[in-house]
């Protein structure tokens, strides 16, 4: 048990940080069916400009995005989306929910079409007090990674600038000069060969 403890603590830490990352965006998202507080205009603009893409944690296929975000559930460690991508397959065999406070909920399991990773479930039948969950896709935070659109923009600009800094320019000019010297030497040898061939043809 003691040898498993560090691994368990590491997994819990990873899951917590992943959930907090998704929850951070949730705090900026629009009000959902649970009656979350409405966001300020600047928060709404920020969320629209930098939406999240949710990826399969195993094969990195896109599963959905934050534009279809409805809510996050801390008790079940999952996020609720209105729709998902074609990379999510639905097992049509209905199952009863085993989660606390979800008695009477009928679910269908969700899997990644690329790697068959279990992603969560979709609510197909719910009691009246949980009607807001019906037909929503519940993705487990453990099975989801996220990518913020535009997050690599600064890095790309930095790389572009790096290509044209003074040091790189000197190296490029040095390489061009070396290539010119090689071409000049090859042209000289080519002329010598052509001259010898010309003399040989005359002698014959």
Swiss-Prot record:
Function: Required for recruitment of CENPA to centromeres and normal chromosome segregation during mitosis.
Post-translational modification Phosphoserine, affected residues: 13, 16-17, 204
GO biological process, one term: pericentric heterochromatin organization
InterPro entries per UniProt: Mis18, Yippee/Mis18/Cereblon
Nucleotide-binding recorded as keyword: no
Classification lineage: Eukaryota, Metazoa, Chordata, Craniata, Vertebrata
Summary of subunit composition and partner proteins: Homodimer, and heterodimer with OIP5/MIS18B. Identified in a complex containing MIS18A, OIP5/MIS18B, MIS18BP1, RBBP7 and RBBP4.
GO molecular function, one term: identical protein binding
GO cellular component, one term: CENP-A recruiting complex
Principal subcellular localisation of the protein: nucleus
Keywords: Cell cycle, Cell division, Centromere, Chromosome, Isopeptide bond, Metal-binding, Mitosis, Nucleus, Phosphoprotein, Ubl conjugation, Zinc
Name of the featured protein: Protein Mis18-alpha
Gene: Mis18a
Domain Mis18 stretches: 51-149
UniProt entry tagged with the keyword Ubl conjugation: yes
Binding site for Zn(2+): 56, 59, 112, 115
Family, similarity comment: Belongs to the mis18 family.
UniProt xrefs under PROSITE patterns: MIS18
Covalent link Glycyl lysine isopeptide (Lys-Gly) (interchain with G-Cter in SUMO2), residues: 133
Compartment annotation: Nucleus; Chromosome; Chromosome, Centromere
């Amino acid at each position: 048990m003691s040898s498993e403890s560090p691994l368990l603590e590491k997994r819990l830490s990873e899951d917590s940080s992943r959930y907090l990352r998704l929850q951070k965006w949730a705090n900026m998202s629009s009000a959902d069916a649970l009656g979350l507080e409405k966001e300020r205009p600047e928060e709404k603009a920020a969320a629209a400009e930098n939406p999240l893409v949710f990826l399969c944690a195993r094969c990195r296929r896109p599963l959905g995005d934050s534009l279809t975000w409805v809510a996050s559930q801390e008790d079940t460690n999952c996020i609720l989306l209105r729709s998902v991508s074609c990379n999510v397959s639905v097992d049509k065999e209905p199952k009863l929910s085993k989660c606390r406070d979800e008695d009477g909920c009928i679910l269908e399991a969700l899997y990644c079409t690329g790697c068959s990773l279990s992603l969560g479930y979709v609510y197909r039948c719910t009691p009246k007090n949980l009607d807001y969950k019906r037909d929503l896709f519940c993705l487990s935070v453990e099975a989801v990674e996220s990518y913020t659109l535009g997050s690599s923009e600064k890095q790309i600009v930095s790389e572009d600038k790096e290509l044209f800094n003074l040091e790189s320019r000197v190296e490029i000019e040095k390489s061009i000069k070396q290539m010119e010297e090689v071409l000049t030497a090859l042209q000289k040898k080519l002329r010598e060969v052509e001259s010898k061939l010309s003399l040989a043809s005359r002698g014959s």
